[in-house]
Design a protein with these regions (language model features):
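Alpha/beta-hydrolase superfamily serine-hydrolase fold, recognizing
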Residues: 1-288
Length: 288
């Protein structure tokens, strides 16, 4: 047996990276992303397809709240293994958070193979910088931006916590006030060695530049972290490794166990005010 990463041979590595195989059928879950998000757009005040960059995919959807003062902002970066989904599938939590007095922003970004992962990270940073610059236009507080993402979005959200990019975008180093990371990938070396690299085309330099575990936050950012019980060992290991590294740096980390969830439906806990996940996030934002 030849190990290609840690103690995985190639076949086992592919199994570890195959999140889709952990659920019987992904189709109804994806349909629920779309239908629940459409319901939010139909029933809540919102500003849709607001441009934050030069290309068509660089747009975001905003769900403001009517508050007396500037509100916290929950920014969501969708998953899809960096090649699927859209902001239109990603605002299912809007009612839960706006009822709690939190503005919601669902970010769209270009996908592989149209763009590189480095460009996706750049676009998400541009979106966060846009939110910071325009927050007061929709009742948001630019000092209380909480970023969140699931799966590939968890990776992208963690890259928003990395140091070294903020000056290029004209934002403060401590821009992010908190983060929620769900079932993310934070070490891209196994991704480079596995089937996702068919569309990502990562090289060793990309792994070094774009792995959140190699670019941990320099500020003590409060984190909420979770993953589903049915995740593969590698997905669980990566979340555990990121949490350990963050705690070692002084970040307050709250792990939320979520029984009876999967890699794909774990995000719906953000849409249910009484769920442990939504409660933890809102409490971390100082609003519970």
């Amino acid at each position: 047996m030849t190990f290609v990463y840690r103690y995985y041979d190639q076949a086992e590595l592919e199994r570890q990276l195959n999140a889709r195989a952990t659920v019987p059928d992904i189709t109804p879950i994806l349909a629920r992303y779309a239908s629940e998000s459409a319901r939010m757009r139909a029933r809540l005040p919102c500003r849709l397809s607001v441009s934050y960059g030069a290309s068509e995919p660089e747009r975001l959807d905003i769900f403001p709240v009517a508050t007396r003062g500037p509100a916290s902002i929950f920014v969501f970066l969708h998953g899809g293994y960096w090649r699927l989904l859209d902001s239109a599938d990603s605002c299912f939590m809007a009612e839960c958070f706006t009822k709690a007095g939190v503005c919601v922003v669902a970010v769209n970004y270009a996908l592989a193979p149209l763009v590189t992962l480095a460009e996706m990270v750049r676009q998400c940073r541009a979106a966060i910088a846009w939110v910071h610059a325009h927050a007061r236009d929709f009742g948001g507080d630019p000092t209380r931006i909480h970023v969140s993402g699931s799966s590939a979005g968890g990776h992208l959200a963690a890259m928003m916590l990395a140091p070294g990019w903020q000056a290029d975008f004209g934002v403060p180093d401590n821009l992010i006030a908190g983060a929620t990371l769900l079932s993310g990938l934070y070490d891209l070396e196994p991704v480079r060695l596995g089937h996702p690299n068919e569309w990502l085309k990562l090289g060793a330099a990309d792994v070094a530049a774009l792995s959140p575990l190699l670019h941990m936050p320099e500020h003590a950012v409060p984190l909420v972290v979770s993953y589903a019980p049915s995740e593969t060992h590698e997905f669980k290991r990566q979340s555990e490794a990121y949490m350990a590294a963050a705690m070692a740096l002084g970040c307050p980390v709250r792990f939320v166990p979520l029984p009876s969830t999967s890699h794909y439906d774990i995000v719906f806990g953000l849409a249910e005010r009484e769920s442990p996940l939504a409660h933890a996030v809102i409490e971390t934002m100082g609003l519970a």
